[in-house]
Amino acid sequence: MKLRLDVDELNDDFFEETRLLGITATLKNYQFCMQLNTNLGYDFRLNPEIEIHLRRKERSYYFSIYQYKEVNSPLTHYLYQNQFDGEYLLPEFKHMDFIWLMKYDLVDDDKCNWIKQTVRNLSGVQLVAELTNE
C-alpha cells in the first residue's frame, strides 16, 4: 500500500481561521515594524528561528519574519518580507513588499478593518489589500 500526502488538505488546514494582508511600502522592514509597533501598540520582533531560506538559481535567499503574539490570546501575527535581493518569497505577489499573516485565532472583520486602515495611514505605505488563500 502506497500512502500519499494530501497537500491541498494541508493548505486548507494551515489557512483555517487566518487573515492575510498584502502590503506595498517604501520602507525597510525594521522601519515598517517600528511604525506598526508605535501605531498599533504591537511588539513585532524579528524571529531569526523561523527565517525562510530558499535556494534558487544557485543562490541563497533569506526572507525575514517578524512575529508578535497577542497577550492573553493565541492570535499570532507574522510579517513576512516578500523580497530579498531581487527574488520573491511569493512570486505571485511581486507587487507586495510584505505579507501579514494572522493565525491561531479568529480575527473578526472589525479588527481586520482597523488594522488595514491604520496601516494605510502609515508614512510610506502605498497599498494594503486583504488576500485570499486560493
Identify the residue ranges that each predicted region occupies.
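Short cationic amphipathic helices and targeting signals
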Residues: 18-25, 96-106
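Conserved functional micro-motifs across diverse proteins
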Residues: 11-15, 31, 49, 53, ...
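Short, well-structured hydrophobic secondary-structure segments
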Residues: 24-70
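Short, surface-exposed beta-strand/loop "edge" segments at domain boundaries and coil↔beta transitions
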Residues: 27-34, 73-76, 86-88, 106-111
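Long, continuous compositionally biased terminal/linker segments
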Residues: 4, 56-94
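Short, Lys/Arg-enriched, disordered terminal segments
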Residues: 1-9
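Glycine-rich, aromatic-bearing surface loops/beta-hairpins
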Residues: 98-102, 107-134
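Terminal, regulation- and interaction-focused segments at domain boundaries
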Residues: 8-29
